[in-house]
Amino acid sequence: MPKVALKTGVELYYEEHGKGVPVILLQGTGFALDVWQPHPVRELSANHRVITIDPRGIGRSLCEDAVLSIDQIAADIVELFDRLSVEPIHVIGHSIGGRIGIELALNYPGRIRSLVLAASGSGSAVRPGEDAFPMPQHRLLVRLIERGLEEHVRYEILVTEGYFTDKFRAAQPGVVDEFWKTAWKNHANVPWYLRYVMARHAYEATHRLPFLKLPVLILVGSSDHAGGGAHFPASKMMADRIPGSELKIMEGVSHGFFWENPEMTAKILESWFRAH
């Protein structure tokens, strides 16, 4: 699959699947595009031109070490849109990918067809309690230092309900293990992972949410405990602040609902795309 040298200073790796109205999938912190296979690329590519990327510094997207910001990642993506001539485009942003999607919609109005904020947030201002501070959570840094990056990611996926509910992990251990292997294969290294964590927590767009002037779907699992359980209240608070947005709570799934219940997720997304 191709790479493109961008003026923003990154050799960006991307993949395309299917034909139709374009959709870009933006994954969570530190992950390469591999996590979108087979779900939901397989389902969405039946009717859409699906684009996935390794963001700068992750997987096969090469660039020099540098300070990272959400608006910088968004600029990379917009230049990719220019090269591929794919606008207007549906943006699906999972976790940190939702922050990138918000930045795309705010800074490049008219280029985004619709925005799906999947288990995401707009910044620390929508987080409850002590997590409202604009810095990485103390517990995250402690776990990362104590366990190391690989064990930190493995533990979140295989042991906690951070990505999958206890019920799903017990019933589908093979699916969970395969997701872990896929997620780790081209995962960010320690320096780049920390850059993304810092960029995620430095980002704040909560005060700008009322200025979003496009269709916005907010998806969150009822059992999403990732990030200390902040995604569920953050999703509700974003829905209150984004005019005309639609909030969909997916019962019985956690942060990784794309992979925990791919059929239900694809059905919701296809219904949204048909309407927008």
Report residues per predicted region.
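Active-site loop/oxyanion-hole signature of alpha/beta-hydrolase fold enzymes
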Residues: 51-92, 267
